[in-house]
Amino acid sequence: MELSNNQVIQLRNGKCGVVASFNDKPFQLVFDSFTTPIGRYNAELKNKNANYDIVKVFDGSKVENVLDVFKKKFNTDDLTLVWESNQ
């Protein structure tokens, strides 16, 4: 799975974040309290620490305010699921 602009991601630990881009190329994952380079994830969107594995990717084009993604009560039910881990 290759990440792209306007996507919301959900980690195994439940945190949601957004894909940040530079010159239309995704390069960082941004969360409420940290950022991480996309290069830390393999092709299956797994991290060295399983708690930070990406388990779901959503189309974030419907998100009106990107800061809402960082709220604990952010609801992904209204977003279109693009990819889900099989584990």
What are the roles of these predicted feature ranges?
Residues 28-32:
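SH3/SH3-like beta-barrel fold
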Residues 1-13:
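Short coil-to-beta transition motif at edge beta-strands of beta-rich domains
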Residues 6, 26, 54:
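Exposed beta-strand and adjacent loop surfaces of beta-rich binding modules
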Residues 9-10, 20, 57:
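Short aromatic-centered micro-motifs
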Residues 16-27:
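Short beta-strand-centered aromatic/proline hotspots
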Residues 13-18, 78:
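Short small/polar-residue motifs
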Residues 34-87:
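Intrinsically disordered, low-complexity, charged/polar segments
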